[in-house]
Design a protein with these regions (language model features):
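Nucleotide-activated donor-dependent transferases that construct or modify glycoconjugates
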Residues: 2-21, 39-41
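Short amphipathic alpha-helix
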Residues: 20-28
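Membrane-proximal helix-turn-helix segments that form the acceptor-binding/catalytic region
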Residues: 24, 106-111, 155-175
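A conserved catalytic-core segment of Leloir-type glycosyltransferases
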Residues: 48-112
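Conserved catalytic-core segment of nucleotide-activated headgroup transferases in glycan assembly
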Residues: 91-92, 96, 201-254
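Active-site proximal beta-strand in glycosyltransferases
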Residues: 120-122, 132-149
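A short, active-site helix/loop in glycosyltransferases that binds the activated sugar's phosphate group
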Residues: 169-192
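Carbohydrate-associated surface elements
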Residues: 178, 195-198, 204-207
Length: 254
């Protein structure tokens, strides 16, 4: 009988933001685990704030009832309302009850997929704390990738929920050394382990190393940023560097 890991995470599996938990899911698959990858829920309210291509992709996954990628099955639940840092949606009531308004029932879905009992219960989202009381597991892990209070989308209730999960799981792993001190609310520091982000060497070995045509006319030396440009992007730092390194070309790709 194969080992199983249930991953309750923030970003949907096909997101353009392929972050730590996506890579861990594939690593678990390589180790022979069956993986159920559940990401943060959507709701009808989402369309009011942003009917983006990302939302449409999440809706597509939900309507299909989830999809498989090898040994990984990924799914986006849909609820009547979901936790957000907005009036009412930031309340403890929404945070603690959104799963009771999912259609189909998220808990039934998980159990019907055969993940009512798992070897590992994995978190990187504060929205899924109820799984600690509803799923049978051998080990539970919370991965802290960033300091949650640094994100405007994270409500006080969500931060408190993350702390509650941290104090309940068997192990907490974190990606930056300063996070251990920042999370003073985590009581048992002995279960916290520093596990920095890794590098997919095979990806870079196979990559095309030719200079993109779009960059040919931009003089060297070049400083290139590739990634998300969101409210956490340090524009002031980039401006400071560009001002003090006038002979360098700064290229931002988002």
């Amino acid at each position: 009988m194969s080992k199983k890991v249930l991953m309750a995470v923030a970003n949907y599996y096909t997101s353009p933001f392929q972050v730590g938990s996506h890579h861990y899911a594939r690593a678990f698959e390589k180790l022979g685990y069956e993986v159920l990858f559940i990401s943060n829920p959507i709701s009808p309210i989402h369309k009011i704030f942003a009917n983006s291509s990302e939302l449409k992709e999440r809706e597509r996954i939900y309507k299909k009832g989830g999809e498989s990628a090898g040994g990984i099955f990924y799914y986006v639940p849909r609820s009547l309302f979901t936790p957000q840092n907005k009036p009412f949606l930031s309340s403890n009531f929404v945070l603690n009850n959104w799963q009771n308004f999912t259609c189909p029932s998220l808990l039934n879905f998980i159990k019907e997929r055969g993940f009512g009992k798992v070897d590992i219960l994995w978190f990187d989202s504060p929205l899924f704390g109820f799984l600690l009381d509803t799923i049978t597991y051998k080990k539970s892990i919370l991965r802290i990738a960033d300091y949650a209070k640094g994100f405007g989308a994270v409500s006080d209730a969500q931060f408190d929920a993350e702390i509650k999960i941290a104090n309940s799981v068997d192990t907490v792993i974190y990606t930056a050394k300063n996070l251990k001190d920042k999370y003073a609310e985590i009581k048992d520091k002995s279960k916290m382990y520093y596990l920095p982000n890794g590098i997919d060497l095979d990806f870079f070995k196979a990559a095309d190393r030719a200079l993109p045509q779009e960059l040919e006319d931009i003089p060297e030396p070049r400083v290139i940023y590739v990634g998300a440009i969101h409210d956490w992007f340090d524009v002031d730092l980039v401006y400071y560097c560009a001002k003090n390194l006038p002979n360098y070309s700064f290229i931002i790709i988002g």
